[in-house]
């Protein structure tokens, strides 16, 4: 039962971050039941998310939010496998040139959805206010 609860929470979390759509989660839940697979494995098998992204949200996300340290948007997006080292370097260069925010550039390049940036920034800011 606990595994089912964790899987539902994973699906909700990924939807909240706008990493998967309602339709994708419905298909994944059907496939999960039909094939007895874990939700994250189904999402990876469909090619909707990377294994690194699933692992980040299963093992690291709650830890990051619970720790007293500050984590940057850049760090979280990289750890979640949503941006590559090369993309991060290009964003940093553009930041120096344009003085725009990291998230703004990532969205403008269409590497990350604006709602995903909002999700991370909101969670990170909320955690900092709570500490």
Which stretches of residues belong to each language-model region?
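Non-catalytic accessory regions
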Residues: 1-131
């Amino acid at each position: 039962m606990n595994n089912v609860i964790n899987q539902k929470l994973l699906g909700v979390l990924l939807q909240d971050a706008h990493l998967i759509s309602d339709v994708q989660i419905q298909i994944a839940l059907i496939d999960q039941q039909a094939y007895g697979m874990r939700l994250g494995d189904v999402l990876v098998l469909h090619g909707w998310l990377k294994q690194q992204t699933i692992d980040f949200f299963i093992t690291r996300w709650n830890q990051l939010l619970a720790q007293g340290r500050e984590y940057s948007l850049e760090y979280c997006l990289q750890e979640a496998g949503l941006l590559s080292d090369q993309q991060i370097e290009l964003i940093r260069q553009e930041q120096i040139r344009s003085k725009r925010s990291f998230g703004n550039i990532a969205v403008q390049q269409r590497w990350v959805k604006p709602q995903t940036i909002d999700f991370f920034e909101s969670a990170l800011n909320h955690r900092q206010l709570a500490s």
